[in-house]
Amino acid sequence: METSKSSTMQVSFVCQRCSQPLKLDTSFKILDKVTMQELTAPLVTTAAVKPGDIQEVDSNIEETFAENRTDGVSRRLIPPARMMSTESATSFTLIGEASDGGTMENLSRRLKVTGDLFDIMSGQTDVDHPLCEECTDTLLDQLDTQLNITENECQNYKRCLEILERMNEDDKEKLEAKLKELAEDEDRLIQELEEVERNRELVAKDIEKVREEAERLEQEEARYQKEYSEFKRQQLELDDDLKSVENQMRYAQIQLDKLKKTNVFNATFHIWHSGQFGTINNFRLGRLPSVPVEWNEINAAWGQTVLLLHALANKMGLQFQRYRLMPFGNHSYLESLTDKSKELPLYCSGGLRFFWDNKFDHAMVAFLDCVQQFKEEVEKGDTGFCLPYRMDVEKGKIEDTGGSGGSYSIKTQFNSEEQWTKALKFMLTNLKWGLAWVSSQFYNK
């Protein structure tokens, strides 16, 4: 059994660049002392290594192996040299079992020496060892390229040196003449600089005299300025008193003129629009499905509208037929002259009752009747007066004569909120025109 048993020993070194496993040359097995000294000899830029260092390393380094009792194989990993210390870089792996203890010990020592040799070689240069053949060729190519560059630089320096050495005496004389000329220019410029410096000193003295004179004049100016300021202060006080009286008189005159020109109707009733709504004093008259205006605001807008028409009628001395306007804020209404017990409210609270109670619609139609009477009264004295939207009191509609030509009902029943809102907007526009006419007739005069 022992004679048929084969013993296998295998060592694994890796390339320090590509980390590929290496197969060492057989020459590593027969290293004598002379070869060791040649391989480990230091470079010119490296500190000298004593010949006995390698032997000392060999004699001091002790390696231990972990042996598996089950298969009798000793194993150890050899990492790359750049990531190891000098001692750990000598590690290797043995696979198999030696024939006897003495052979195993000699092999271990030889492999330690090989590992130490690679570490020493790595310490002599900037390249880590060992390297595979391909990485070695690549390294040699890089070194050849660097050598060619260095040789080219050396040749350039040599050519420059030859050019400098070939310079003749004429060039030297020309340079000396040029140097002499420059020296003369330097002396001339130094003299000019000295002259300028002397002139600068004279100018500095003149400046000092002028500065002293300026200080004296400034002191006199300050004294005169102080006296002037005192007189000016007294004058300003008197001017302030005079201007104060003039401003008071001017303000009183402006207020008087403003009161004379003030149009009470324009100042009290501001009719405008906000989107699709007509507004009076910023109260919107109408409502839309997308903008459900509160009824309190609509009632307040109706109250302002009734008050406006009532004021215009009083200014003209107009007495409405069939109805009397009763402005009471957001609870304004119309009183029937034929039936005084009958009141037509121009306010509403909404809700289900709103759809069945037509008094609100009757009140709006009655108000439209009053606007029509106002229009007819104005046309009696001014035939050229015309409201922008024609009103049909019998149908309770307002026609857009200048636009689409359609008519819009002022009633809420059987009517859409959009058309009702547009009819109210047209009615406010007519009132705005009536307000402008009254203002032009009674206030511009």
Swiss-Prot record:
InterPro entries: Atg6/Beclin, Atg6/Beclin_C_sf, Atg6/beclin_CC, Atg6_BARA, BH3_dom. Belongs to the beclin family. May be proteolytically processed by caspases; the C-terminal fragment(s) may induce apoptosis. It is found in: Cytoplasm; Golgi apparatus, trans-Golgi network membrane; Endosome membrane; Endoplasmic reticulum membrane. One of its GO terms (cellular component) is Golgi apparatus. This is Beclin-1. GO terms for biological process: autophagy; cell division; defense response to virus; early endosome to late endosome transport; positive regulation of autophagy; regulation of cytokinesis. Keywords: Antiviral defense, Autophagy, Cell cycle, Cell division, Coiled coil, Cytoplasm, Cytoplasmic vesicle, Endoplasmic reticulum, Endosome, Golgi apparatus, Membrane, Mitochondrion. Its main location: cytoplasm. A motif (BH3) lies at residues 103-122. It is a peripheral membrane protein.
